[in-house]
Amino acid sequence: MVSLNTPLCDFGWKAIDFNLEGVDGTYWNLAKAKGPHGLIVMFICNHCPYVKAILPRLVKDIRTLKDLGIETIAIQSNDPVNYPEDSFENMKLIADQFNFSFPYVMDYTQETARSYKAICTPDFYGFNRNLELQYRGRFDATGRGEAPSDNVRDLFEAMKLISETQRGPLEQKSSIGCSIKWRE
């Protein structure tokens, strides 16, 4: 497993549209996914220990952010042929197991991950209502272990600020995770 860190936020970068199939049978794009105050686009997968470590807390925070007008879409871009745990069928199982309240979509061609310059899972992009990037950072300090007792909810706090001001925090810490598994 290769661990990578994401680059920091390119403030104002405009979200690139996509049309990806969700585990709910719906095709999702930016217009359908975004909330009145913003959108989280996150690249996750099923097998990465960094994602597994945060998933229960991530799902909980996303539910709270929804009440603040922030919607979320999760994109799985890993090669499911070489990583069968990341198959579409297994995505459905994870979404059901954790009771996802957000769309979980498959990036079969990996074009969306490439257009966003996604590096790893998890990789978080926080956009304001105009779909301008305001946050590209970590979920929290967990890494792939237990959450520290003094855990700061970086993504939650950033998106709460974006919902209130449409601007992200100037100080951001990069996400760390497993490399995206590119097709050959």
Specify the residue positions occupied by each region the protein language model found.
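Chalcogenol-based redox active-site neighborhoods
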Residues: 1-163, 168-172, 179-184
